[in-house]
Amino acid sequence: MFMATDKGTVKKTNLEDFNSARKVGLIAITLDENEQLIGVELTDGNSEIILATRNGIAIRFDEQDVRPMGRTAHGVRGIQLNYGDEVVAMDSVTSENSEVLTATEQGLGKRTSVSEYRKQTRGGKGVINIKVNEKTGIVIGMKVITPGQEIMTVSYTHLRAHET
């Protein structure tokens, strides 16, 4: 299981560590004050991870760069964030022909081949994913998709279905 927080922290924990669930639940990750969990992925241990930030930066790295940790561990740095930036989305990549779909608050979307995101080591600065400005607004989401996958976008005023 792979987790990411808005502060750029990532953590990998073996699923077997959650076998002894109780009625009150289990601690999966220790968060700092004002830190939020933004994503959890079930991975095979050999995937690649992409993190996307609100200011248009993304990083792609091997899941194997993160060692498995115990349930109560905090995690390690997945991306080095610029001041005021935060991670808004995380996804795993299982195929090199996948694409990254990035959405902004002004309703714009960008579809980019995963191969255009050079692979870095965990904790790097990342690359420009999408230029953020007044026209685009900040990044609100990112998802790894496959060619031909149907995508539905929903906003407060429109409902659209697109086949990509």
Enumerate the language-model features and the residues they cover.
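Conserved structured catalytic cores and adjacent interaction surfaces
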Residues: 1-127, 136-150, 156
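Conserved small/polar residues in nucleotide/adenosyl-binding loops
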Residues: 157-164
